[in-house]
């Protein structure tokens, strides 16, 4: 690759490393083209970009993005999954895919600027999706209000019942 092309690749990688909410670095050695294509499709569905990188260019980009700690895992064939919109999606898709295809090795990653190992990535993959967490939080906030409304309605309902009974007694 000529030097200007390398500089463009490094600049693009630096932007993605800086802007991504999470990164997952993998070793794809042993996977055939069809399997990698299947993996890319699953990642694309989840809104994740998956890119094979040259380690030397990735090291330069990591230095510019101030996350040089990932240099330790930039050994051998490396591909990076960039979680731009969601921090959990790359981990979830890759961990699930690695269960089916043992050749895919998760090397490590970055979450909100902090380097994490493969075990933390596996823990991250167990977190429910953002929408589910928000739904649980709102349900938790709604429950006390619903209970309070029911208590208020219960008193009003009891008052109406008492008044109806008094009316019925007077009618007789």
UniProtKB/Swiss-Prot annotation:
Source organism superkingdom: Bacteria
One GO location term (cellular component): ribosome
Transmembrane segments: none
Keyword RNA-binding: yes
GO biological process: translation
Gene Ontology molecular function: any one: large ribosomal subunit rRNA binding
UniProt entry tagged with the keyword RNA-binding: yes
Role noted for this protein: Forms part of the ribosomal stalk, playing a central role in the interaction of the ribosome with GTP-bound translation factors.
Subunit structure: Part of the ribosomal stalk of the 50S ribosomal subunit. The N-terminus interacts with L11 and the large rRNA to form the base of the stalk. The C-terminus forms an elongated spine to which L12 dimers bind in a sequential fashion forming a multimeric L10(L12)X complex.
PANTHER family linked: 39S RIBOSOMAL PROTEIN L10, MITOCHONDRIAL
Family under the similarity heading: Belongs to the universal ribosomal protein uL10 family.
Protein name: Large ribosomal subunit protein uL10
Species whose genome carries this gene: Halothermothrix orenii (strain H 168 / OCM 544 / DSM 9562)
Underlying gene: rplJ
């Amino acid at each position: 690759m000529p030097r200007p092309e390398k500089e463009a690749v490094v600049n693009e990688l630096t932007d993605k490393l800086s802007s991504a909410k999470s990164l997952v670095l993998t070793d794809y050695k042993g996977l055939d083209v069809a399997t990698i294509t299947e993996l890319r499709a699953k990642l694309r569905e989840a809104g994740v970009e998956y890119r094979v990188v040259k380690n030397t260019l990735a090291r330069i980009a990591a230095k510019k993005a101030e996350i040089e700690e990932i240099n330790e895992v930039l050994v051998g064939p490396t591909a990076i999954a960039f979680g731009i919109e969601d921090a959990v999606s790359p981990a979830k898709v890759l961990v699930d895919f690695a269960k089916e295809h043992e050749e895919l090795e998760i090397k490590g990653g970055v979450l909100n600027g902090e380097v994490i190992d493969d075990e933390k990535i596996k823990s991250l993959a167990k977190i429910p999706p953002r929408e589910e967490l928000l739904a649980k939080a709102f349900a938790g906030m709604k429950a006390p209000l619903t209970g309070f409304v029911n208590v208020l309605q219960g008193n009003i309902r009891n008052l109406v019942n008492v008044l109806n009974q008094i009316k019925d007694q007077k009618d007789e």
